[in-house]
């Protein structure tokens, strides 16, 4: 079916320029690249762009820690990111940076238009300020005790223990992450974007039917709770663009970051000497299509602030947002300690790009669902699908064509009706690629791969080859098998670019979507070479181990007690809440006959007596001074039968052992039986 060529601009979210690309990032870039490659195969004009998000306090501070300029750091990071994306065959037309002349000019233009149109408001706000560093502190650069659950060492915007959200001014005993100083409140004039003015427009955009249902529903919740003005300014020192006519004030990173999409495209147009396409794609009444592939964590910025900024500055809005979920590994959040926080470059040292591209694609849909990279399932699926079903189809037929017929295919198909079954599926598979129902496309392709392999099993060319006078049948059967392989690889070309290139070299023919309607007949193919190798679990094990070693190599060296006794794996707040710690009075302390390690402690919990055996004798050779002391015990530990009697709990102590054991005691005023929280 002939399609009208469309003009399409596609972006991925801009990776932040202070860290390496990992497998979580790669989900989005692979998803977008598969979609883009399909659109290009169908003859559409696609511009696929990205850039590094290169501004903000974290980049400024990390560069200071490294002893280099922010410009040097983001330059090195950009090269690393581009190398990683190229290694995964992400086919960007341009990869730029938000720290660019194009982005500065466009940010200033959009801000000026918003200001002229009355959408920028000024007001004075109070913020936490680091008096030692001389800087205002973003929420994530303040830590203190959670005002809700009282957990220490929590960020200024939310508690990672109980999940509560709050403002940094609500923290108990806040400290600057930058200097350790106690921050003070200080006033500053800030600039705000009047987002509520665009509420009606945004609601109409939400109801247009273009957005994913889950995105539209979430936006409706935000509308119902009321849109707020958005602070788009930050005070010096700050790494970014200074706001015009506002010395010492800088654009907040989230203002110029999405403008980076425009900046990267402008840079691409300038490189091409193209003076018309930028306006053609970004003008208010543009008929070009604009799609942003993003993660679900940044929907708020892309569905509210970004279209409102564009509307208020007389530019076009996105055609749609394509939102995906997070990546887990082996059913859990990526973990550095378990070796499942895997960098893109580390993956490529152990596996090819096609393998991960295939696995992610097979699991993706148009919904905002999390994707689990189960490493054992990954090995099984790649071997079962790519090797056993697709590549094996070629290897089972190619040898006969090469050896018996000098590489020349038959002049006719053995089963034209079966071939038509394959080509007829192009429409539904194409629709699945187009609508981002990638898993559905893969399932349909693999079902047809099964059909193709059954055909070869039934025709048994290895048997026919031994039968006199059946050369024509053998050539026709193998020609049929290789043509079905060609069709399958054409459909998989957006997913497996490296394998597709090897298949094209073998078939001596480009894999083109429309070309499959005409089978390869009386056509000479090249000698068959192995197209893809099986993968093994030992490669996964090596990958995980390498990831662990990378973490060790980059981690700051641990000294002191933590080096000898590392912190245990993280537990949940619910797990911790199960432990009942109580203040206890030591009524009696005595030696245990037959043991040179234990003391027998009689503890008073405020009306309840407990008998506890504790291995602290080496540090307290005379137990008498312990009598009358307060300590802390685990009160709900199951009783443990010992040969000296039953131990009904555990007292808390610190230290490595031997003489260095220190019984914990609460401050004066604590009472026996009180819970330790």
Swiss-Prot record:
Position of sequence motif 'HIGH' region: 15-25
Subcellular location per the Swiss-Prot or TrEMBL entry: Cytoplasm
Record: residues binding Zn(2+): 146, 149, 159, 162
PANTHER family documented for this protein: METHIONINE--TRNA LIGASE, METHIONINE--TRNA LIGASE, CYTOPLASMIC
Record-annotated tRNA-binding domain positions: 575-677
An example Gene Ontology biological process: methionyl-tRNA aminoacylation
Residue interval(s) of motif 'KMSKS' region: 333-337
Membership in a protein family: Belongs to the class-I aminoacyl-tRNA synthetase family. MetG type 1 subfamily.
Source organism, top-level taxon: Bacteria
Keyword Cytoplasm appears in the UniProt entry: yes
Species annotation: Klebsiella pneumoniae subsp. pneumoniae (strain ATCC 700721 / MGH 78578)
GO CC terms in record: cytosol
UniProt-recorded name of the protein: Methionine--tRNA ligase
CC cofactor: Zn(2+)
Reaction catalyzed: tRNA(Met) + L-methionine + ATP = L-methionyl-tRNA(Met) + AMP + diphosphate
Cited InterPro entries: aa-tRNA-synth_I_CS (IPR001412), Anticodon_Met (IPR041872), Met-tRNA-synth_bsu_C (IPR004495), Met-tRNA_ligase_1 (IPR023458), Met-tRNA_synth (IPR014758), Methionyl/Leucyl_tRNA_Synth (IPR015413), MetRS_core (IPR033911), MetRS_Zn (IPR029038)
Name of encoding gene: metG
Keywords for this protein: Aminoacyl-tRNA synthetase, ATP-binding, Cytoplasm, Ligase, Metal-binding, Nucleotide-binding, Protein biosynthesis, RNA-binding, tRNA-binding, Zinc
EC number: 6.1.1.10
Keyword Lyase: no
